[in-house]
């Protein structure tokens, strides 16, 4: 097939972790066997923050969920590729799924700019503010904008181009 699909949001990483399901094949919305029918498949995988948890608990949960998802990508590296940029995306072979990482409900940052650096360094490219954190509104912060806003480019100097 020559079909191409870009899906800008899924909570599959959260559910995979909570329900102990693999990325290769599962009964969730996203699985590599389901994506295999597309010549090009791009997925933004959002790590969801459970709003019943405190900001600190959500922050700890985030790292467990993210690490689990990255391990699944690594275990399936022939058919799943983690991307941080358009350049990364152009290197993904036909038939492989390209994943970009995001966080949904960035309240787990909890006003701590250093956490924005940590998210950026952990390969996240977007953070959504929703629910309580945004007063019911949705806002998206891209990694480049977040890096510029928090001084990431100045702090790391040489990575200025990467941040933009």
Residue ranges with predicted function:
Residues 1-148:
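N-terminal hydrophobic targeting/anchoring segments and the immediately downstream early-domain regions
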Residues 138-164:
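Loop-centered beta-sheet repeat module
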């Amino acid at each position: 097939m020559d079909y191409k699909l870009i899906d800008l949001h899924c909570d599959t990483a959260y559910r995979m972790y909570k329900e102990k399901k693999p990325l290769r094949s599962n009964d969730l919305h996203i699985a590599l066997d389901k994506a295999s029918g597309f010549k090009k498949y791009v997925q933004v995988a959002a790590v969801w923050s459970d709003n019943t948890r405190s900001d600190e608990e959500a922050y700890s949960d985030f790292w467990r969920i993210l690490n689990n998802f990255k391990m699944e990508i690594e275990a399936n590296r022939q058919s799943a590729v983690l991307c941080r940029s358009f350049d990364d995306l152009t290197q993904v072979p036909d038939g492989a799924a390209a994943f970009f990482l995001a966080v949904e409900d960035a309240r787990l940052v909890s006003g701590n700019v250093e956490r924005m650096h940590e998210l950026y360094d952990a390969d996240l490219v977007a953070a959504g503010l929703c629910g309580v954190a945004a007063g019911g509104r949705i806002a998206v912060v891209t990694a480049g904008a977040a890096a510029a806003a928090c001084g990431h480019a100045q702090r790391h100097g040489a990575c200025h181009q990467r941040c933009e």
